[in-house]
């Protein structure tokens, strides 16, 4: 009950406080800054994310939908993906530079990921389906080393052939970069113990600063 009351209090703060409303007001940014992030929804969302973490918000999720092409992917490669990739490149670059400029790059960890990869082979409808065996993730910021590539897939991007890591390993790594206690055990309302990370999960040491 105490935890529920705490979350309700946080919700009231987010809804009613002048401080919270100010964080969501992108008009407080200079036109140059807004232009640097890009005019599309993704760019402005990334800028909002920076404002939120600067204001003390611990976790921010920015969604960028529209990558699911189960059919006619050739057309998407020509007309759909190029503007999305341009917006993604601009937003991530601006966020990376802005965090560093404001001294937040060692306090904020950024994860750019999808929930799965895409099938290496084109399906009968000319598209690509969901593929859980291989995917790529970009991480930068606090607690992480720079310029490190971990793992490798085969030529078709079908399966890892070098240093495979699991989603649990990734989650464990991000928590480690943020300084969380990876051995912590939480308890459900009925007293059942739940580990913060899976017992089999291991941090990706190659990309952690320590």
Give the positions of each predicted feature.
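Ligand-binding pockets and gating/stacking loops
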Residues: 1-210
């Amino acid at each position: 009950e105490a935890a529920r009351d705490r979350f309700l209090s946080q919700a009231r703060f987010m809804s009613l406080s002048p401080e919270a409303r100010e964080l969501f007001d992108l008009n407080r940014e200079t036109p140059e800054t807004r232009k640097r992030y890009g005019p599309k929804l993704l760019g402005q969302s990334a800028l909002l994310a920076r404002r939120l973490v600067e204001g003390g918000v611990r976790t921010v999720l920015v969604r960028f939908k529209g990558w699911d092409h189960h059919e006619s992917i050739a057309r998407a490669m020509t007309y759909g993906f190029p503007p999305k990739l341009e917006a993604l490149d601009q937003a991530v670059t601006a966020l990376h530079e802005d965090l560093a400029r404001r001294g937040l790059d060692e306090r904020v960890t950024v994860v750019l990921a999808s929930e799965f990869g895409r099938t290496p082979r084109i399906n009968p409808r000319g598209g690509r389906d969901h593929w859980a065996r291989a995917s790529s993730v970009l991480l930068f910021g606090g607690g992480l080393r720079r310029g490190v590539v971990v793992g490798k897939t085969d030529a078709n991007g079908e399966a890892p052939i070098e240093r495979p890591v699991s989603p649990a390993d990734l989650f464990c790594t991000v928590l480690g970069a943020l300084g969380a206690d990876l051995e912590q055990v939480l308890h459900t309302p009925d007293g059942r113990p739940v580990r913060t990370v899976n017992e089999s999960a291991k941090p990706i040491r190659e990309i952690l600063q320590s």
